[in-house]
């Protein structure tokens, strides 16, 4: 991103913030921040989970677990349950990337492409091709990492000294709050407002 465009994005965030201010985004970011120092291991191993409300031990996880735990702790939304119910209702709407013919409640919600699909289906997608948009606390961003790896994180309410929003994520060192918003090519931007949150809760 060129410097002028980056500055414009940050200005838009400042101007738009009051319209989206409220307890909901702050609860989400706080729940993600609470994971820093607790989740200290990146562990992508497949695990059999309880259902609903299943999780691997809190000291470990992957990038999606930051989002899953934040929505569960901050908003009472169980993405394990939501993804399972939505995939059962329309399995063909979800990416066919893993050779599966039915849902797997242990892993479906822990895959970035599935979360991207879910967020788009509930109307949370913020288009990437319509010019600069603000990045607000609680927004969810996806990226493509080197090696064609998918990544996901949550926009923090904290900024760098230059004014860039920090990102809450787990990229290999446990949950961290870091300046990586513009570090990798973005593949998705999602904002879960009240309407989208209601749709998620209705799927539980």
PLM regions: where:
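N-terminal secretory signal peptides that target proteins for export/translocation
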Residues: 1-5
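Generic serine detector
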Residues: 7, 23-26, 156
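N-terminal capping segments
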Residues: 20-120, 124
